[in-house]
Amino acid sequence: MSTQNKKLSAHEPQQPAHTTVTDETASRRTRYLVVSRSGDTLVGADGTLHYLDSPPEDSLTDVSLEPKLMKPEARHAIEYRAVYVEDADLAALTQELGALPEGCRVSTAGFWFYPVHADPAGRARYGAALAKRDYLIEMAYSAYTGESAPVDPHKGIRLTGSGEMVFPRIEPAVMALIMSEDNSRVLLANNRLWPRNRFALIAGFVDPGENLEQAVTREVYEETGLDALRLDYRMSDIWPFPRSLMVCYRVTVDASQPVTHLDGEIHSARWFTAPELAQAIAEQRTGEPKLEMPGTNAVARRMLDEWLQEKGL
């Protein structure tokens, strides 16, 4: 794979807040985020994304990472696109580009541990690229008939020879920040498959026939034995493992009731006050954690940070 005339940049360029699309800006600069079939990408020493100024020669396909409803006046001078390559081609590209002074490598942690605190815009692009990859690269056949379903270049969707439209799959999941009625404590859980010091929010997939409120109520009861007294929607996030949309709620419960683990998935659960939670997160930042909390890339961490900010911590 040739990388001739391809420059690599470690950091985001300065962009104007808004650029009106005129004849002068219609041919905007394009930067490419290279993503392999398995989901790896190019990162620098600081963990943030590297972009190419032109696409690799042996790419599978590429797609825009801009929101579909972006108004022309909101577009920046740079368009970002994801370009997909085979795993071996990304590895070869990394070796060629590794000779540059700023260096690069293939991400081994991938999206799971991407430093959203350092590069939230890049994290959003990476998540979108992974979500689109599943449809553009992997969903080549109808799940019902097994027919080949290539992407129609005019409509941008997959069509079988018999005319069936194969749409992207999105699997909704729910997450719960469980809170005491007085809002002084939150309940975090330890999964049986995790190290004993790792705690996170309750989460699970929506079952067929459920709405989101029923799903989060069920998940809380199944994993803690507690009844939801109140639900408050807070936020949502892309979680492309495999193709989830995570919908997050605050769930108020009676903290005087005993916590049980009905479905066997949870090993233990623990109530945290705001100072206790803030201390656990601070220790994780210093590299000497007694408890492992959700990383900065996870929407669970955003839920916890939001609650702590309301407490002045």
Enumerate the language-model features and the residues they cover.
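Residues immediately within or flanking Cys/His clusters that coordinate Zn2+
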Residues: M139, G146, G156-I157
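The catalytic Nudix box helix
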Residues: L201-M235, Y249
